[in-house]
Structure formats: C-alpha cells, structure tokens
Amino acid sequence: RVRSLSSSLWTVTHLTALHINDNNLSRIPPDIAKLPHLIYLNLSSNKLRSLPAQLGNMVSLRELLLNNNLLRVLPYELGRLFQLQTLGLKGNPLSQDILNLYQESDGTRKLLNYMLDNLAVHPEQLPQRPWITLKERDPMIPTAMFTVMCYNVLCDKYATRQLYGYCPSWALNWEYRKKGIMEEITHCDADIISLQEVETEQYYALFLETLKERGYDGYFCPKSRMKPLQGKQLILVANAHMHWDPEFCDVKLIQTMMFLSELKSIAERALSSMGTGSLTSDPASIPIVLCADLNSLPDSGVVEYLSNGGVAENHKDFRELRYNEALTNFSCQGKNSSSSGSITHSFQLKSAYQGSLMSYTNYTYDFKGVIDYIFFSKTHMSVAGLLGPLETRWLTDNNITGCPHPHIPSDHFSLLALLELHPPVTSSSSLNGLHLPRPQVVGLQPLTSDPFEA
C-alpha cells in the first residue's frame, strides 16, 4: 500500500479523476491543488489526520470522498468547493456539530455553505485601478472635459447562491454590497453616472438620496433623456441593458437597432424643439454618450453595428433567421436598397475602451469577458483618460474564481472615461466652450432588460 505520493503526480495536470483510496496515506501535500481539472477525487480508507487548505482551490471538484480516515477537523476552505455534489465523510471522528450538519437533508450543501460563510477573509484590500491618461487638454482650445461612469451594480434579486455559489452569503447580501457599490461610485466621482440593474426600491432608498447629497440629479424613467447645458448645446446621454442569454445574439442585435432607432427619434424631436436656432436637422449633430451592458463581446454583431455604423443583413448573429423586412424599419438612414444589404445608422460612435485595455468587465466563474461599454460621438468628442483594469495578478494570488467577492460588490467592474467635448459649430466666428457645472447627472437602468429603459 502507498504511504506517500510522488511529486511527479502533480505534473499530470490533465487528470480529471484520481483514485488513491485504500492506501496508508497519512497526509496529502498542498501540491494536489496543481491538478485543477480534477472532478473526482477518492481519498477514502487511508490514515489522513488533516487536509491541506489548498484543497479548497480545486473548484472543479464534483465528488470528494474522504470516508474512513482519521479526520477530526476540516479546513473551512472546503467551503469554496461550490460545485461539489458528493462529499463522503463517514467513518471519521469529526465533531458532533459537523456531523449533525452533514447528516441533515442536503447536508453536503449546508455544510459547505457553513464553512464558506465562516471562512476568514484575507484582510488585504482591493488595489487601486490605475488611471490612464491618453491626452492632455489644450488650454488654447475651448473644450469641455467631463467624466462618465458605466456600472452594472448586480441587483439584489439576482445575487443568489445558486448563481454565485463561490461567494459567502453575507457578502451577497445587499446591505453589505451596497456599501462597496456606493464607495465605488463616490470614489469615481463622475459627472455622469449610468447604472444598470437598479431596483426601484433601491433607487429611491439608496441611490437617489445618497447621490443628491453629492450634487447629482437622478433620472429613473422609461426612456433615454437629453439634458440641455447652459442653453448652448444639447447632449444626449443614453443607458441600456441588453438581453443576457448568449444563445440569443439575434435578439441583442435587434434590441440594439431598436435602441438606436429610438435615439434617432429623440434627437429629431430635440432638434425640432430648438426651432430656427438649429443649424441642421441631422440627428447625428447632437453629441451622444451611450453607456450599456450589452451582454455582447467586442467581436459581436452588436458592437460591430455600433462601431461601424451598420451590419450586413446576413450577419451570422442573425442566425440565418429571416429578419430582412423587419430590419429595414430600424435603419436609421431609412429603408435600404437591395444592393446595400446592410442595416445602418448615422451616429458615428466609438468605444472609449479600445483594444485589449480591459480583458474583462464581467468576471464570474463561468464567464470572464468584456460586455460593458461607453460609446461616444467621435465627431464631437475624444477620450482624454480612462480608468484601467484591476490587476489580474491580485485576483489569481487571492484565488478569486469569480465575483462578487467580499472585496468586490458586483460581478461587473465599473468603467470610467474622461471625455473632451468639442465646441459646437456656430454661425459666429467665435467659439463657445461647453461648461458642465454641478448638478451632475446619474442615469439608472431599471431591473428589466428593455433597451429603452435607461
């Protein structure tokens, strides 16, 4: 019978099952965590008196058998095994409290939840995300500088152990998370804040009252709104949250087209209300800032449509479904000619975060990627600075498999951009800059995924 394990075993990292039961092992080395793909681990019928805390890092485990050993205590790190379905503990001299919990109905899940909720959290605080300056302001050019924040706060309704089993229940609780969320918002101190997944009750009880004290006006309404600034120029700020299911890329693309079609109508009404004071009837003449959780990756049809001004009618994201006739109704440049074969819009938009600056804005166990965006009218604005990403090494060093986390209150990271708004073209030879004083603006996206609610 085996008394010790060879270190070469930890190099076989592709293993998904390991049977080392019925041996004379008295300890399991911490290096067992170097087998990250293990789904099944049988350590039963050995002479184990303790388990390494690193066993809790093996979050792929579905079955862990520890029957008939000499275990008196269990490391609380086992609570991190949120995908574990079977935990074998029979035949161990464990404390009666542990055994009582384990022997209850759904005892494995209750025991793991208990250990996770009582696992000590490392006191190290979240490191500061870097500020990235892209350009300096030219004092000779009369432009307006303002900051825009986009943040999906993860509503309380969706913050469940079923969806986020790797997070302690106390750290999922809204009373705990709201403190970190407000700290994030107030630390960024943006001129314009766009929030997604805001519940009605929390809007009135938390966001509206707290942010009013800091000089913000709040909007919680069924459509995007524009706000005139000093009577000089309109700026249209829109906030959206698209459908979440990755299987329905066609739905997201159509939602986005409907969204821009509605923005076009809002811009046209704004220009009409300005009467003869407007030099143009082109809706794209109004600067636009679009903040959104698009639930779409940078290579998606949704982002292509926004960035390039259109997509082909036969784009793969339509999944070969026949949307042709319906789609022409959402072309912001009117019905397309048959030779065009594209659905287009006239807004010249650009994403503030370009390239691979952010590897992810949504960070969960099952998914890590960029799905949150700040778009702006590139003919009217430019980016002067951005809030950079959280250091990836901090996440890996602290074995954070997903968010939320006791130090991270949402499954999304906020975006913050410093935009430079160029002065509008006027009939006068002099240029008028745009001043953005307090009150600031906070736009809150209600809980539904209706793209018009912003």
Each model region followed by its residue ranges:
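Active-site surface patch of divalent metal-dependent phosphodiester/phosphate bond hydrolases
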Residues: 167-230, 307-311, 374
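Leucine-rich repeat
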Residues: 10-14, 33-37, 56-60, 80-84, ...
